[in-house]
Amino acid sequence: MAFTAQDVKKLREMTNVGMMDCKKALQATDGDMDKAVDWLREKGLAKAAKKADRVAAEGVAYATVVDGVGVAIEVNSETDFAAKTDAFMDLVKNLAVVVAQQNPADVEALKACTYPGTQLTVTEIMQEKVMSIGENMQIRRFARFPENTSVAYVHAGGTHGVLVNLAVEGGIDATEIGKNVAMQIAAMNPKYWDKSLVPQADVDHEMQVQVALMDNDPKMASKPAQVKEKIAAGKLNAFFKDNCLLQQEFVRSDLFQGSVEGYIADAAKKLGGKVTFVDAIHYVKGEGIEKKTDDFAAEVAAQIAGAAK
C-alpha cells in the first residue's frame, strides 16, 4: 500500500514521533496507519496514539435536555461563519426539541418530522434555511436518553457536545456532578466508559504490544515468556487509566484527587445520595469528516501547463 507525505504528517500528529521514524514505520507496514502506530510503539518510540484526526467540517455539536429527555445532535455547515449565526443555532436547538419530543428512528425519519411551530417538515425548513443562509447544511447524527437523569455540556461554542446519563438516588441534584464528568469527557476523550466495556480483542492487542515492546528491549528480551506476560498484564491498568472514563484520573483535582468513578461516589455521598454513571454521548464537531485539501503548488503547476498549450 502506497503512502503520501500527508500520511507521514498524520502519523506524526497521532504519535508525536519524528518525521523520519514515521516514514520508516509506514514503509515497514506498507502504509497501514494502525500497524504503523503499533510498529512505533513496539520500538519504544511512541505511546498509544492520540485521537488527533484532523477535523475540518464546520457546524455545531450540541447537547441539551428537553422535558427530562437528553439529546445530543450534530449539524454541519460549510463554514464556521454560518454556524455562528443566530439562524443556524435556532435551527439546531429546534432540531433537538424535535428529537426529544418526536423520537425519530434515524436522520431520515427526523427530516420527515414536523418542525416546531410550523406545519412544515424538517426537510422543508432546512431548504428554506439553506436559501436564507446561503450554505448547504446537513444533519449528521443524533442520540437521546429518555431515562434517568441527563446532564448536557457544550464546549467552546459547539466544538464538543457531551450528554451524560446518570442514575440518581436520594433525591439529590446531580447537575454539577454530571457537568464535571461531561467536561472530563470533552477534555480527555476516553475511548471507553469503563474497563469492563473494553473488547477482549483490544485487551489482547495491548498485551501483544507490551510483550513486543519488551522483546525489543535488551534488558527485557531474555526474560521468560510467562514473566513478560505478567508484566504486560500489570501494564493494562495504565492502559485502562488512559482509555476508560471511570478509571481516568479526574481532571478537576481541586475538587477530588483520584479516579472519575471515585469522584462521582464522593460527590454524591457529600450530597446525601448515590449517583451511578450509566452512559454518555460525545460528539466532536466534524469528527471523521475530511474536507478536500487544496494543493496550491499543484494548482499553480496545472495553470502554467494549461497556459503553455
Tell me what each language-model feature is.
Residues 2-309:
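N-terminal assembly/interaction segments in proteins that build large macromolecular machines
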